[in-house]
Design a protein with these regions (language model features):
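Alpha-helical transmembrane segments and their helix-entry boundary regions
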Residues: 10-11, 85, 200-204, 231-232
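Acidic, glycine-rich loop-and-beta core segments that form the ion-binding/anion-interacting portion
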Residues: 29, 34-95
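C-terminal structured "cap/appendage" subdomains that terminate the fold
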Residues: 190-213, 220-226
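Helix-terminus/linker motif at the lipid-water interface of multi-pass membrane proteins
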Residues: 1-5, 66-93, 97, 115, ...
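Hydrophobic alpha-helical transmembrane bundles that constitute the permease/transmembrane domains
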Residues: 15-23, 55, 59-71, 78, ...
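Small-residue-rich hydrophobic transmembrane alpha-helices
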Residues: 87-145, 149-151, 184-203
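Short alpha-helical transmembrane segments in multi-pass integral membrane proteins
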Residues: 2-56, 113-180, 222-261
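Short amphipathic alpha-helix initiation/capping segments at coil-to-helix junctions
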Residues: 102, 163, 172, 179-187, ...
Length: 261
């Protein structure tokens, strides 16, 4: 806004962000402390498929934000009009920060879990998962505390004109939508965990459920049942379905392994 480029400036800033991120990462990559590099090797189709399986969950996670935004915008537009969509913009922008925190936690734990799993250290793997979930729970508690005590303050960042209707929509939306993060953070960590311990099927199912399938179905059904509030609580419903599904698949996989042994 200070430059006066308007929406063009917002688009330009969005394009510059990944370039800045890559530039920062390049500093480490080119330093003497880095021991990871690219080497020419004959490609293996089987190895490529294996790597892709482990990466599908992350791909779906990146894709889901766009899908959710499109579905939510259309549903909210039909129920609450442009002001409802504006309220969702407030909720969505703040949720990006929360998702980024949990994704950072999961991405930080994933290589440590993967290393311990590769070394055949199941005790260390369980310990890392336990600590990851504990930190996740602490962050979730902090987020809920901030949302419920500073709702109007957070909304005012995006509501410079003090629109009362926008405030009312966003106030309810922010509190209901962020209830979903009580479970969302745990799911993000679990998906990263199962990718790290070479269980791509559970990770893929979890990603597709929470990122596309469950969230879309829950949003459509709950919107018809409860209107705008139904859309706000669809995240909690979808994440709960995903969590229960992951637990079921993990339990089923564990029983199968015990039967083989």
């Amino acid at each position: 806004f200070p430059v006066g480029l308007g929406f063009s400036g917002a688009g330009l800033a969005t394009a510059i962000c990944p370039i800045v991120t890559m530039s920062v990462c390049t500093i480490h990559y080119r330093s003497s402390r880095n021991h990871v590099g690219f080497y020419w090797k004959k490609p293996s189709f089987r190895h490529l498929i294996s790597c892709c399986q482990l990466g599908v969950s992350a791909f779906v996670g990146e894709l889901s934000s766009g899908v959710i935004a499109i579905v939510f915008n259309f549903l909210i537009l039909g129920i609450a009009g442009n002001m409802g969509v504006a309220a969702y913009g407030v909720v969505a922008n703040l949720s990006i920060v929360a998702f980024a925190i949990f994704n950072g936690l999961a991405q930080g734990a994933q290589p440590l879990i993967s290393e311990s799993y590769g070394k055949g250290q199941p005790t260390q793997v369980r310990k890392l998962l336990k600590w990851s979930l504990l930190v996740c729970f602490a962050v979730e508690t902090l987020i809920q505390l901030i949302i419920w005590t500073s709702t109007d303050t957070l909304i005012s960042i995006f509501n410079s004109e003090n629109n009362v209707q926008l405030l009312n929509y966003a106030h309810t939306g922010l509190r209901l939508y962020f209830l979903g993060f009580i479970v969302a953070g745990i799911n993000i960590v679990l998906v990263a965990y199962f990718s790290a311990v070479d269980e791509p099927k559970i990770a893929i199912v979890g990603s597709f459920l929470r990122g596309i399938i469950a969230i879309v179905i829950c949003a459509v059904i709950l919107a018809k049942l409860f209107g705008l509030n139904g859309i706000w609580i669809s995240l909690l419903a979808a994440e709960t379905v995903t969590f229960l599904t992951i637990l079921f698949l993990a339990y089923k996989d564990r029983r199968k392994r015990m039967a083989v042994v």
